[in-house]
Every structure is written in C-alpha cells, then in structure tokens.
Amino acid sequence: MNYQILNAYPDVKTLAAWQDFLADAAYPTHYITPGFFTDPFIRGGERFAVLAFEGEKIAAVLTGVDTGKTIVSGLAVRPQTVFRKETDRAAAAKALLEGMLEKGGDSLEVINFHTWEPVEKSKSLGFSSEVCSGGDAVVMLDLAKGADVLFKDFSQTRQSELKKAMKKSELIVKDLETDGEIDELYAIHVEWNKRKGNLPDSREDFSRLAADKDNRKTLIAVYQGKVIAGTFFRFCSAPGGGVIEYAGNNSLEEFQKLRPNPLIGWRAIEWACANNLTHFSMGASHEFLRRFGGDIRSNYRYTFDRTFLKRHEKKEKLKKLLVGTYLFLPVSARRKIKQAFGIT
C-alpha cells in the first residue's frame, strides 16, 4: 500500500475516494471525515490526515495533530484511525506509519494513535500497544437493535427516571436553534467551565456548532421556557451508516432533579436509530453512561517512540504506575496527598 498526506481539505478527486471509503469503513466517525479540516474544535497542533491507498481505493484513514515533536491521533475514548472493512489492517497501518513519519520529519520523537480495531503484527512495525480498559473504555450501543429494544436494555434506574421525566409536560427536549437558545446555553457553558476550572469555548465557535447540521447535533432541555441543559454530539452520516459520539454536556445543577440529561440522551438515541446510524459511542464508561446499557468497549492505543531508550514510553509507564498506586491507597491517604499538593 502507499499513502497520501493531507494538510487541508481534499481536492475533488481525493474527496470522491474518501467518500467511497466512508461507505465501506468500520466505525466511521466525524473526525475521520474531510470535515475534520473545517471543524472549529480541533486544537493542540497542526491538523493533518494520512490516507492509506490500496490501488485506487482508500484502505484506511488517520487524522491527527502535529505539534513538532509529537503526533497524536485521537484518544482512547475517541479513535481517529479507521479501516475499510475486510482490509489488511497491518499493511494499512504500515502505510499510515510511513505517512506520519514523513509528516513529522526529523524533529518527530513520538507517535500516539488509537483505533477501534486491533492492528495485527503491530510489534513487528515497531509499535508498542495497549488495550484501553478501565477509565479509558467506552459504552457502545448497537443501534441496529432499534430504540425500543435498547430502552429495555437500560438499567432499571435509567428506565424509571426517564419515565418520570417524560411525564413532565413542561420539560421538553429539542434541537438548539435560535439565537436566544444559543445565548442561554452559552451562559450555562461558561458557568460550567468556571466550576470545572476550564476555559470556555468562544461564542463564535458555539454559534458554528449550532449551525452545523451535517456533522453535529446539539439537543437542549427546556423547562418552563428556560434552557436548563444541553448535550453535544458528533456523527458521521456515511452511506453505509456511521457512528454518533457523545461529545459533552453543560447543565444547571439546580435542575438535575428533573433528569434533563438522561432524557436528552434517550432522545439522541431515538434520533440516531431513525437516521441510519449504526453505533452510539458514549465517549466514556462512567456510571451515568453505563445506565444506558450497551457494551463496554476497550479500544487500542499504539505508540511509536523514536527517542533514545524510548524515553516517552518509559515516562508514560511510570505515570500509569504512580496513578495506579495512588488509586490503590486508602481514601484518607489520598486526601492527605491532595492536601500536600494543594489539590481540592
């Protein structure tokens, strides 16, 4: 296989080949479509894509960011490497690696990329690999089951709270549409990030998010005319069916007793089932998401370390060892460590 590196939106010929790939790709998501190059929420470096070709057809697509010394493609909970169904994933991964090495040049030290499916013979290509379990796993729903069957797979707690929420006639879930709704949700977004100690997105990017009907869906919960919550989703509407991903939520704490977020999640599942999407990735696997049923899916992380004695790999292993040791400690000991470092 050979490869092509892109640093911007593709030309007409490449776009056609890319669209053909998406129709036969396993787990196509928004961030492995050409829309990756125009999405306002890609940050952290220069964005690029590597396309692995087998003849005239694309066999795999990888998107990511290049920071100079590091190339990163996706996260454990959000892979940005996808293969055509039935393709030789090892051969495709080799072509993708060659493309990333060319993209990074002499200054490149380490590559990290993530996949939904395992890459056979990855060690022979020079990769270290890891199954992303635990907190790096995701809840995945098979939308082919249909909304009614999926609802029955929800936990009893989730079914009960949804039935109660749906009885509240003043609580509705709808698409984010008007400027007034955008203003209300943006105010919640700013306050939510303030509580978390994060920087909010710009009002301009927020407006673009609401305007994007091809790759994103934002659902809001409105109670007595007031926006009280909003959840953001990304999706790929490939001809063969794509994946929808939970991308984030902002909500008002004082209205959580109304259960707006579970209701938004349910309406999103209903919409996805009705719109030819094949899988719903919840983007994480904590208890709130597990109550939607589905499978706990562990994706794959691959690292290619070019440094002397593989410095980056060793640093990452030490970090995981320290985190694992910390989590194993009694709560009282963890509290003292937090106090010592001024962590609240």
Question: Where on the chain are the PLM-derived regions?
Answer:
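A conserved beta-strand-loop-helix scaffold within acyl/acetyltransferase catalytic domains
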Residues: 2-55, 61-70, 113-136, 142-257
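Aromatic (often tryptophan-rich) hydrophobic motifs at membrane interfaces
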Residues: 53, 61, 84, 94-100, ...
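A short, structural micro-pattern
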Residues: 58, 75, 104, 132-135, ...
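Active-site/acyl-donor-binding loops of N-acyltransferases
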Residues: 66, 122-149, 275-344
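A gly/proline- and charged-residue-enriched helix-loop-helix capping module
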Residues: 74-117
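Amphipathic coiled-coil/heptad-repeat helices and related helical stalk/stem segments
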Residues: 92-93, 158, 202, 265
